[in-house]
Design a protein with these regions (language model features):
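A short Gly-Trp-Pro
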Residues: 1-116
């Protein structure tokens, strides 16, 4: 996930698809208008200020390894996760895992986020 203003589109505008989610608040999935691959999602809790970018859509995905694996309770048994990266069965409390700088960035986003 990253601040929306740090995401640079190389061409075109994504096609936004409103999709139900387990929270009941839904999510907006932004897709490439040509191939329809999901590029990022926006979840209701974070609004439009944070994008959950699909790392496989980046020019250099190897530069952005995961910080944590989530929802591992539903992973396939043949998927082997490295022990060097935290893994949790569902979601997690950010303050338990995120570095101080990331927590500060989240705080800044929340304080700048317009009221709904």
């Amino acid at each position: 996930m990253i601040e929306a203003d740090r995401v640079q589109l190389l061409s075109g505008e994504p096609e936004v698809v409103l999709t139900p989610s387990n929270s009941g608040q839904g999510q907006k999935i932004s897709r490439c208008p040509v191939c329809k691959v999901a590029v990022w999602s926006n979840y209701a809790g974070a609004g439009d200020t944070v994008r959950f970018v699909r790392v496989g859509t980046l020019d250099e995905p190897g530069q952005v390894p995961p910080d944590i694996h989530i929802f591992t309770s539903t992973k396939q048994p043949w998927v082997v996760l490295p022990r060097s990266i935290p893994a949790v069965p569902e979601y997690y409390k950010a303050s338990d895992y995120w570095p101080k700088e990331s927590l500060e960035r989240r705080t800044a986003l929340r304080s700048a986020k317009p009221a709904r």
